[in-house]
């Protein structure tokens, strides 16, 4: 039963991380390279940060003559909410944030905070991988000056209590 409950709460995983992009961001250039700035709240040992390092390596190996990727971990540039605001102003290009932070910009993200929204990991992935459906949700922040680009599963959440939850 607990396993089923955890699976049903998988959507809360999405609350962990979603990557945003900004429309018309400030184009910072260093030595002829376009600088791409990414803010993340996690430490340098966290899997999300390590994923960004892999992204940086991928981009710079293939496009290193055109792009330099800078990653700012540990809320170095401010809280998650502040980094979202930095994408809005163009000070940075991307912020890694959860859907709870997006709720203030688009009500549609409140649905992802609902427990038991999905009855299985498979149903969760089926919805999240439906690009036409998710694109409509991602577009909901356009009027706020940024676009959600994607999602990824960062694990499951747990419920704790004195009595069994059935």
Question: Where are these predicted regions, by residue range?
Answer:
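Short, low-complexity disordered leader/linker segments with a strong preference
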Residues: 1-35
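Immediate post-signal peptide segment of exported/extracytoplasmic ligand-binding proteins
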Residues: 26-40, 60-68, 142, 164-166
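Extracytoplasmic "Venus flytrap"
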Residues: 37-54, 74-78
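Extracytoplasmic/secreted proteins, especially bacterial periplasmic and envelope-associated proteins
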Residues: 47-54, 58, 82, 86, ...
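Contiguous mixed-secondary-structure segments that line small-molecule binding/active-site clefts
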Residues: 56-60, 98-166
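Alpha-to-beta junction loops
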Residues: 64-67, 83-97
């Amino acid at each position: 039963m607990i396993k089923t409950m955890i699976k049903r709460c998988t959507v809360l995983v999405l609350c962990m991380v979603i990557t945003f992009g900004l429309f018309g961001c400030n184009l910072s250039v260093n030595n002829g390279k376009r600088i791409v700035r990414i803010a993340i709240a996690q430490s340098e040992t966290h899997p999300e940060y390590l994923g960004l390092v892999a992204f940086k390596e991928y981009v710079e190996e293939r496009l290193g003559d055109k792009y330099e990727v800078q990653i700012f971990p540990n809320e170095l540039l401010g809280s998650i909410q502040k980094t979202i605001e930095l994408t809005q102003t163009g000070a940075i290009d991307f912020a890694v944030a959860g859907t709870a932070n997006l709720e203030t910009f688009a009500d549609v993200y409140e649905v992802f905070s609902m427990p038991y929204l999905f009855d299985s990991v498979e149903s969760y992935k089926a919805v999240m991988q439906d690009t036409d459906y998710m694109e409509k949700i991602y577009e909901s922040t356009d009027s706020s000056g940024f676009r959600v680009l994607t999602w990824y599963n960062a694990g499951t959440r747990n419920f704790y209590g004195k009595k069994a939850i059935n």
